[in-house]
Amino acid sequence: MTKALKNNDGFFERESTQKLLFWLVLAAGIFARVYRFGLVPNGLNQDEAFAGYEAWSLLNYGIDTAGYHNPVYLTAWGSGMNALETYLMIPFIALFGLKVWVIRMPQLIVACLSLPAAYSLVKRTVDRRAGLMAMFMLAICPWHIILSRWGLESNLAPGFLLFGLYFFVRAAENERYLLLSALMYGLSLYTYATIWPFVPVIILLQLIYCMAYKKLRFSRYLLLFVLILFIMALPLLLFLLVNYGYIDEIRTSFFSIPKLLYMRSSELSFDEKAKKLELLGDIFITQNDKNIWNSPEKYGLFYYITMPFALFGLIFCIREFVIGLRRHEYRPASMLTVQFIVGLPLCLLLKANATKINILFIPIVIFAALGAYFLSTVTHRRVLTGVACIYAALFIGFEVYYFTDYDEDTRAHFSYGLEQALEIAEEKGEKIYIDQNEFYTKVLFYTQTPVDVFRNTVQYLYYPAPYLHALSFDHYYFWVSPYQPEDAAAYIMPIDSDTGLLEEEGFTFEYCGCYMVAYKENGE
């Protein structure tokens, strides 16, 4: 640790002040994530709907939509879906039923736990004030607030990687924490398939670094660490063998290793590197991946003032690593860079958006906090207070925007009003026709169609396919336009649809959020 980092005293160095700030920041971060939870975003995303429906099916019927018992990886759309969030949803669904806020609980809990984890990690690698700043920056970060409030399964990855790193750093002081680190890193493999090649590299580099400085040694805890990781990774290794055709799929009454309809390995390649770097640059510079459900254009992923601080913080961590090498000293701040540097090649393997490269974002937020903190150590400690005040003002502005304009702007993407539209249609029609652009997974979720009924009645547009599109199941039909409207049917369509033919046929219309329902009274 540099001398400058040790020479901060005054009001913010008082233990009572820092404890108060810790609880204030944690409370503000949790409030930003739980206020109107389940209502904003208002509606349901197709992937979280599928994860929730699969959890409900596994809980009540013992199989998923592909007929597998407890699969290690969900078949879902045809080309697969990460399974951990689905399994984490099951206890909440068992307690409270299949509801939107219920299936978002795992993401909320992991996000809230990430706040004290970031504090504790940076406190141990730098110091307490830096830890408070890291926690504060993550607590108010637009990207992290947004991901915490809906249930995209891939967005669990940053949290579990953070937990894995935190317990690994603790293991340098007490080897017993290696067991928890192995558990967190092992679980991270079930959050996002894209990180499979990178997690072993992250772990290996951390092991080499700590063993080089004699912070870890060959012991029973290290052996257990490796054993736990191997056991947790083994089902996924078998999954790869199954899907590359080396062994048959595995079906048992306890768990399954499925053969997917389509393996998306072709999505990972080093082709079009220039285009991928351009996309990455756009995300880092504009902080906008053009997907409003990930990145609010008005404020950016991390606020637009953040990247210079992040660059400064990255330089600080690299500097710590270099100083440690020269002096042959253990510098735990060096490990903060490992996940970021190892994750960078990911950007060359796929076309980036905020979800696909999400493992880079918590390190970026921590770097930004360290950049602001280190700037205060080489200038004046009040600089950190000033920076925090600017961010607090941005946070207040973002919160107002998030619960007003942003809520309105995202409603169509989350199919706001579809649940109510389906309820009306169920009362008014024997058959229900739904606009073909609607995702069938949302209909499954809201109607809670038994999985055996779905499996026995579903008709797909193309089968097999990497992204299955249902034409119909049970009494639900996904149609282009009502060429010849049926009197006994109800029609659900976007609110801006052409209704001329239905009006001519004497249909009645009811409006629900982004949808309208057309039907004939008494089916006449």
What name fits each language-model region?
Residues 2-4, 10, 225, 239, ...:
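Transmembrane helical bundles and short interhelical boundary loops of multi-pass, membrane-embedded
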Residues 3, 8-245, 278-376:
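Membrane-integral, polyisoprenol-dependent glycosyltransferases
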Residues 51-58, 254-262, 411-425:
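Short extracytoplasmic/periplasmic juxtamembrane "stem" segments immediately C-terminal to an N-terminal membrane anchor
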Residues 192, 224-263, 394, 398, ...:
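Membrane-lumen/periplasm interface segments of specific transmembrane helices
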Residues 427-437, 486-494:
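Short hydrophobic beta-strand segments
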Residues 457-524:
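Aromatic/acidic, Gly/Pro-rich catalytic loop(s) in extracytoplasmic/lumenal soluble domains
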